[in-house]
Amino acid sequence: MFVDQVKIYVKGGDGGNGMVAYRREKYVPKGGPAGGDGGKGADVVFIVEEGLRTLMDFRYQRHFKADRGQHGMSKGQHGRKSEDLLVKVPPGTVVKDEKTGQILADLVTHGQTAVIAKGGRGGRGNSRFATATNPAPEIAENGEPGQERDVILELKVLADVGLVGFPSVGKSTLLSVVSSARPKIAEYHFTTIVPNLGVVETGDNRSFVMADLPGLIEGAHAGVGLGHQFLRHIERTRVIVHVIDMSGLEGRDPYEDYVTINNELKEYNLRLTERPQVVVANKMDMPDAEENLQAFKEKVGDEVKIFPISAVTKQGVRDLLFEVANLIETTPEFPIHEVIDESDTSVMYKFETEGVKFDITRESDGTFVISGYDIEKTFKMTDFSRDESVRRFARQMRGMGIDEALRARGAKDGDIVKILEYEFEFID
């Protein structure tokens, strides 16, 4: 098992803008305001897809931006809410906020969903602001900005394919050739003492996880050598790739190796022999390999399909990967015969705005900079092209206590105040 990790950017859709409009119909004097509200922006929703096994797809698309809501219209018509953006993830994906490290979701079962970036609400149209003293307001809100964040996806990956075979037959070399994994490679027994895993992608954009498992020797089912550790990992795989050294340089007979490994898999008695097995004749670039392969074929018979390859020269590797990918698609998952802790450790996470309404700092040129979730959200939802909206924004700032706080920090008439990229003069 290893942890695959990728960083992506998600943004919920902005809400649609409210509209300033008036009812203008014949025989209807003083029709009044008729601007509709904007629609809600779409959420970015992660959903578990049981057919996915890796995070490979996120290597190519790392930005996910949901659609904004439709703007409000005249005649009191509200904008349409946008459809949520569904992002498929494999089972076992943990989503963390990159900035805070907070776990946003732990996605386990097929169809499970989690809202990772909420869409903004639609801005209100001018019909919402009508009062007895202002029956025809020329004011409307912009849509609320959608939530945006960088998130880290982590996936504890189990291997789809297990490489088995005696030590030093070339399993680590094969894994390094077909994936980005970089296992230790050396010509001595038990080079691999813990499983190395790599994500393999075929030429037709299919992907799977391949494990170079610890070398297996006779007696592994009884715990000899690294036996139990090896067999626990292979128990989780769906396809077994049996790598055999056809060069004979180690002084072993390829057929005897083949029989010994299969006997060990059978003795472990966890349906390992029911898994499809691909026999790989490796090191075919060596001098005596072809002769040894012919002798091996005579002993195993025609019913065993053999893929001659050279992991070093990559000869035959492409056809091997296509065969393995086809077998994975047609082979069901096998049950795991071990105790699994099923205690309920689920946690509900709730999106909350920041507790502090605003913060005031002063730059070297004397400019007062106001920041904070509430004031920045209010600023973005204000339509500054309309005088009435600007006056409303000034009232909202006073209501938040910003004017009073600026005076306490020494602000005087004519001083520059900045919110985001917008600058204005302070008037006492």
Curated annotation (Swiss-Prot):
<dbReference type="Pfam" id="PF01018">
    <property type="entry name" value="GTP1_OBG"/>
</dbReference>
<feature type="domain" description="OCT">
    <location>
        <begin position="350"/>
        <end position="428"/>
    </location>
</feature>
<keyword id="KW-0963">Cytoplasm</keyword>
<feature type="binding site">
    <location>
        <begin position="212"/>
        <end position="215"/>
    </location>
    <ligand>
        <name>GTP</name>
    </ligand>
</feature>
<dbReference type="GO" id="GO:0005525">
    <property type="term" value="F:GTP binding"/>
</dbReference>
<protein>
    <recommendedName>
        <fullName>GTPase Obg</fullName>
        <ecNumber>3.6.5.-</ecNumber>
    </recommendedName>
</protein>
<feature type="binding site">
    <location>
        <position position="172"/>
    </location>
    <ligand>
        <name>Mg(2+)</name>
    </ligand>
</feature>
<keyword id="KW-0378">Hydrolase</keyword>
<dbReference type="GO" id="GO:0003924">
    <property type="term" value="F:GTPase activity"/>
</dbReference>
<feature type="binding site">
    <location>
        <begin position="165"/>
        <end position="172"/>
    </location>
    <ligand>
        <name>GTP</name>
    </ligand>
</feature>
<comment type="subunit">
    <text>Monomer.</text>
</comment>
<dbReference type="InterPro" id="IPR036346">
    <property type="entry name" value="GTP-bd_prot_GTP1/OBG_C_sf"/>
</dbReference>
<dbReference type="Pfam" id="PF01926">
    <property type="entry name" value="MMR_HSR1"/>
</dbReference>
<feature type="binding site">
    <location>
        <position position="192"/>
    </location>
    <ligand>
        <name>Mg(2+)</name>
    </ligand>
</feature>
<feature type="domain" description="Obg">
    <location>
        <begin position="1"/>
        <end position="158"/>
    </location>
</feature>
<dbReference type="Pfam" id="PF09269">
    <property type="entry name" value="DUF1967"/>
</dbReference>
<comment type="function">
    <text>An essential GTPase which binds GTP, GDP and possibly (p)ppGpp with moderate affinity, with high nucleotide exchange rates and a fairly low GTP hydrolysis rate. Plays a role in control of the cell cycle, stress response, ribosome biogenesis and in those bacteria that undergo differentiation, in morphogenesis control.</text>
</comment>
<comment type="similarity">
    <text>Belongs to the TRAFAC class OBG-HflX-like GTPase superfamily. OBG GTPase family.</text>
</comment>
<dbReference type="InterPro" id="IPR045086">
    <property type="entry name" value="OBG_GTPase"/>
</dbReference>
<dbReference type="InterPro" id="IPR005225">
    <property type="entry name" value="Small_GTP-bd"/>
</dbReference>
<dbReference type="InterPro" id="IPR027417">
    <property type="entry name" value="P-loop_NTPase"/>
</dbReference>
<dbReference type="GO" id="GO:0005737">
    <property type="term" value="C:cytoplasm"/>
</dbReference>
<dbReference type="InterPro" id="IPR015349">
    <property type="entry name" value="OCT_dom"/>
</dbReference>
<keyword id="KW-0479">Metal-binding</keyword>
<dbReference type="InterPro" id="IPR036726">
    <property type="entry name" value="GTP1_OBG_dom_sf"/>
</dbReference>
<feature type="binding site">
    <location>
        <begin position="190"/>
        <end position="194"/>
    </location>
    <ligand>
        <name>GTP</name>
    </ligand>
</feature>
<dbReference type="InterPro" id="IPR006074">
    <property type="entry name" value="GTP1-OBG_CS"/>
</dbReference>
<dbReference type="GO" id="GO:0042254">
    <property type="term" value="P:ribosome biogenesis"/>
</dbReference>
<feature type="domain" description="OBG-type G">
    <location>
        <begin position="159"/>
        <end position="329"/>
    </location>
</feature>
<keyword id="KW-0342">GTP-binding</keyword>
<keyword id="KW-0547">Nucleotide-binding</keyword>
<dbReference type="GO" id="GO:0000287">
    <property type="term" value="F:magnesium ion binding"/>
</dbReference>
<dbReference type="InterPro" id="IPR014100">
    <property type="entry name" value="GTP-bd_Obg/CgtA"/>
</dbReference>
<dbReference type="InterPro" id="IPR006169">
    <property type="entry name" value="GTP1_OBG_dom"/>
</dbReference>
<feature type="binding site">
    <location>
        <begin position="282"/>
        <end position="285"/>
    </location>
    <ligand>
        <name>GTP</name>
    </ligand>
</feature>
<feature type="binding site">
    <location>
        <begin position="310"/>
        <end position="312"/>
    </location>
    <ligand>
        <name>GTP</name>
    </ligand>
</feature>
<keyword id="KW-0460">Magnesium</keyword>
<dbReference type="InterPro" id="IPR031167">
    <property type="entry name" value="G_OBG"/>
</dbReference>
<dbReference type="InterPro" id="IPR006073">
    <property type="entry name" value="GTP-bd"/>
</dbReference>
